[in-house]
Each structure stands twice: as C-alpha cells, then as structure tokens.
C-alpha cells in the first residue's frame, strides 16, 4: 500500500501514530478510525516479507532424534500392551523462543498463560521461571498453579460464571483478580469474596473467529451501565476491563474495536459513576503463532491510541496456544489398514478425536499427518511426504499415488482424523505418523472413551541447549 493510499484512507483522522515497534514498517501513520483503514493495514502487513515468522523449525533435528530414539525401543510384535501408544515430543526451547518473541513484540503486555490450553507441569514451571503469570478457570487449575509455589497474585481467575464454592476457595487462597459479566455473579462475589479485584468482561465482535466466545461470555456495551451501577451499589472493587476476540480470527479489526470499547468503559466508570480509576486492561487470548504479526500490530496501534504509555493502566493478556501449539509434536502408530483398491485405503491409528486429536472437534484444528516411519525406514526429513490437496503443478497424483482416509482407534464413526489425504508411500501396519504443532487443546481434553487410555507420554527436549 503506497503512502498516498494510506494518507487518503486516513484523511479524516487527526492524530499521528509512531512507527510500528520491532518491525520494518516504520513510516508514520495516523490513527485508524474505520474498518477499511485497518483492513488496508492488515493487507500491508501480510504482504510485507520483512516481517518474518519466528524460525521454530530450527528445532527439527532434535525432535527427530527424540522420535527416532523412542520408536527404536518399540517392537510392536512383542511389546507389552500400551508400550506402542502415541506419545508427544515437547520442545521447551520452542517455548523459550516464543516467550522472547512475545517480549519483543508486546513489551507492555504481561502474559497470563491460559492453563486450560495445556496444563503440562514442566511447561507451567518453565513459564513461571520466565515470569509468565497464569489464567485459571477452576479450582483444579488454581490448585495446580499454587502447588508449584507460585504466588496467588500471579493468577487471574478468568471465568465470568463461577461455582460458589470455587469463589470461596479462591478467597481462602488469596486469589484476588477475577472476571465477571453479569449482576448475579456480583452478588455471589459480594457474599463470598468481597475484596476481589474485578475485571468486567465485555462482549466483542468475534464473528470471524474459529472459536467464538462472545456467544457465551461478555456483557454487551449497551448493558455495561447495569453492571457499573451494581458495582457501585454493592461497594465492590472494579479493577479493570477484560475481553476476548476469540481464537483463529481472520479479521483483527475486532481487536481495535475491543480496545476502543474498553476505553469507553474506563471513562464511563470514572466520569459517570465516580468509581476509582481502573488500573487493568485484559486483552484476552486467541493469539496464534501464524497470525501474530498482524494481531500484535493492530493491538499496538489500539493501545497507543486509547491506553498510551504512562496512562497508569497495566495491560495483561491470556495467551494459551501461542506458547505451546508449535512446541509439541505427536507420534501415532498405524494399527490397521483396510485396502479399498490398488492405491486407496483406510488407515487406523492408535490416537484420534477422542484422544489427543480432540482438537479436530472442539478447536476446529486440522492436524497434518506426515510419514515418520515406513517399512523400517525413517522419513522425518521429508516434510512433503503427505498432502491434503493435489494440484496440476506442484503436487500431482503421480508424486502422491496413495489416497487414504485416517481414523482413530475407537468404534465411533466420528473418530476420523482426515477424510482424504495423499501419500508418497503405501502405508502399512507398523508405520508411524507424526503430527507437528499439536500442543494446544489436545491432551488437556483427551478422554478414555471406549476404554482407550490417553495418558500419552511426553518426551522433553530443549533445542536452545547445545
């Protein structure tokens, strides 16, 4: 987008913005008052080749070594039941790199990791060491964090609708920060935890998100006055505002609008209801590695306009998948095969949608199987061993002659990992697939449906160490 186009799009705005931090998009821009201008900014960012993704694939060799070592110890013809179960490789070095990238891109925003995303103890411990705080939504999650000798002031109880006994428990453990979005919740808090530091959760436009949350949580802006009035009448402590624009959003103008709406609530609380100045803005979660540059650019713009440096407001966020999705690789064993024709088959693995790939159902993810081990040979280095889509130029049927559907181990017909995939190799029983980037909302929601245990082992590596 040329500077002339930027100027024309922003002609109605009067404020000037400093350059985008930590990127090569350094020309000055005026603040963004309309959706078209934000859309143009996002197009510019998507087309800017200088804004590169974090090179997380540099860890591949160590991941392969760990996969190879684990599989090399398994003989599926003689092993005990369960020894050939699926397992994860967790790269703690990837978590470190992602944290450093967060600090670089969003230095003002303190992350509170969403424990529900992946409650692995070693990941939680590492994040705590790095200075990350925690977003908990239940007694169990609070317990998990506190059991690691983490101070309760590093927890936000980010569930707007809480069980009364959990509120009492939070009070007994001095967990003070808590979200709400309705009057009834305020009455419970007044009764069981009246000293809470409350964050009013507002609804957002998450219509482009894959995982929408405002259909369930968040007070609409037209109803904010009801909650502010109740806060004042009950004598409770309103500390700030929170929101969540959903996960997998394709339009980050929703972030800008949410920050703008939060500013409205801040001003309304002080000017119309005489409440003490609010001190916390919680910008929620939904951050994804693949779209981090776009979402953070818009977020920085919005914060600089509505909550500039020195405004006296602490900015926090609730990232989950951002820190763990690309840090975990799942390995799954081929347990059966049903041939349909010469080059077409149904493949069955020992993990599926009721296990560590429940993210297919609940999180709208599409795991990408790759060939790890075929016919006694490893193929990890071939990142193009499989494809979901054929075309006439780059990925042809002659290169990928074998068409398969991939299924989980349970007896439910819903347990399908991929309805159509194309393979370079004719998969056989005893082979292994690996699925990269399966660290978010996978093991945390696995079930034991049909009697299949899903306590997948985790092998830890650290690609940041020599």
From Swiss-Prot:
InterPro entries: Ala_racemase/Decarboxylase_C (IPR009006), De-COase2_C (IPR022643), De-COase2_CS (IPR022657), De-COase2_N (IPR022644), De-COase2_pyr-phos_BS (IPR022653), Orn/DAP/Arg_de-COase (IPR000183), Orn_de-COase (IPR002433), PLP-binding_barrel (IPR029066)
Pathway noted in the entry: Amine and polyamine biosynthesis; putrescine biosynthesis via L-ornithine pathway; putrescine from L-ornithine: step 1/1
Residues bound to pyridoxal 5'-phosphate: 247, 286, 318-321, 441
Binding site for substrate: 362-363, 412
GO BP terms, alphabetized: pantothenate biosynthetic process; putrescine biosynthetic process; putrescine biosynthetic process from arginine, via ornithine
Assembly and interaction partners: Homodimer. Only the dimer is catalytically active, as the active sites are constructed of residues from both monomers.
Name assigned to this protein: Ornithine decarboxylase
Organism listed in the record: Saccharomyces cerevisiae (strain ATCC 204508 / S288c)
Gene designation: SPE1
